Amino acid sequence: IPWPLSIRWPLGIWNSLFVDDTPFTPRADKSAAWNRGAYLVQGPGHCGACHTPRGVGMQEKAFDERDEQFLAGEELNGWYAASLRGLKMSEADLAVLLRDGRSKHAALSGPMDEVVTNSTQYLTDDDNRAIAAYLLSLPGSEPVKRDASKVAKAEMENGHRLYARYCATCHASNGEGAEYAVPALKDNLTVNADNPLTLLRV
C-alpha cells in the first residue's frame, strides 16, 4: 500500500471514535436460533458493512437491532444494499435465498451474488435459518403510501404498455414471476427500494 495510505496510526484514532468492540452477548429473552442469527449477522457475516447507513467518517451508524438504522439500507460502490428490516418472506424462503441465491419468489444480484458464492452457501441450513429468524424479527419502517389518483392517467397507461412489452413475458402480467425460475416483482426488495440504483443495473 503506497504512502500515505500505509500509515497505520490514523486507524487507531478512527477505531477509538467509531468502532464498537463490545463482545456479543446473547439475549436471554430470545431463542437460541435468534441469538445464533444475531451473532452471525452482527459478527462474521458483517451484513451491516453494506446494508447499514454510513456516517461522516464512513462508519456504520448502528451495530445491532437496538438502533433502527441497523441494516436500514445503504448505497455502496454503485449498488444499493436494500434494507433488511421488515422483510416480507417466510423464514424458509429467506434461508433458501441465502443458501442458493434464489428462492421460490426472489433472486439476488450484484455483490450479494458474491456473498452467496463465497460465504452463505457454505453455512449449515440451521445457520441460514438462524440468520433468517433474526432478520425477520427486525421491524421495518412504515411504507410510504402514494395516492394513485394523483398519478396522471397517461403515465399509468404508458407504464402498463412498457411493462406488457418488456417485463410481462418473464415476470407475468401480475408481476408474480415463475417459482424458482423468474423472481417476482411484487414485494421485491430491489423493485420497491427507495433507491433505484440496483434496479437500474440489473
PLM features per residue range, with description:
Residues 144-146, 180-183:
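Short acidic, glycine/proline-rich loop/turn micro-motifs
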Residues 10-11, 15-16, 25, 29-55, ...:
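Sequence/structural segment immediately N-terminal to covalent heme-attachment motifs in c-type
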Residues 32, 67-117, 124, 131, ...:
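Extracytoplasmic electron-transfer domains, predominantly the class I c-type cytochrome c fold
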Residues 1-31, 95-157:
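Post-cleavage N-terminal segment of exported redox proteins
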